[in-house]
A protein has these predicted regions:
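Residue-level recognition of specific faces of alpha-helices
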Residues: 11-14, 25, 36
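Sterile Alpha Motif
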Residues: 1-18, 42-95
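ATP/adenylate-binding site constellation spanning eukaryotic-like Ser/Thr protein kinases
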Residues: 31, 39-42
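Catalytic DNA-binding helix-loop module of base-excision-repair DNA glycosylases/AP lyases
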Residues: 21-30
């Protein structure tokens, strides 16, 4: 069962939208505990994940990073696709 609040998230997999695969992606970025997501830039996490993978990954990964960071900073649990429009705007600015 997923955590209802940031305080209840003890493992990365407790965070809404985070399953084993994305938890592994976060661990590859040296994020091992949910609290480490507080204050992180999800767009930078996505950029670093792409560098590590050697290719641009599915942009939905960025949406998931946004959802996870926002949740751990006290925001509501939202599905990752809630952040798709925001990500498109933000990444569009950087091009």
């Amino acid at each position: 069962m997923k955590a209802a609040s940031a305080a209840a998230a003890l493992r990365l997999e407790d965070i809404p939208n985070i399953g084993p695969s994305i938890a592994d992606d976060l661990r590859a970025l040296d994020i091992f505990e949910p609290a480490q997501l507080r204050g992180q830039d999800p767009y930078e996490l996505y950029r670093l994940s792409n560098l590590r993978a050697g290719a641009e990954q599915d942009p939905c990964l960025c949406d998931t990073f946004i959802a996870a960071v926002r949740f751990m900073e006290g925001g509501p649990a939202r599905p990752w696709w809630y952040y798709t429009d925001e990500r498109k705007r933000e990444l569009g600015k950087k091009k």
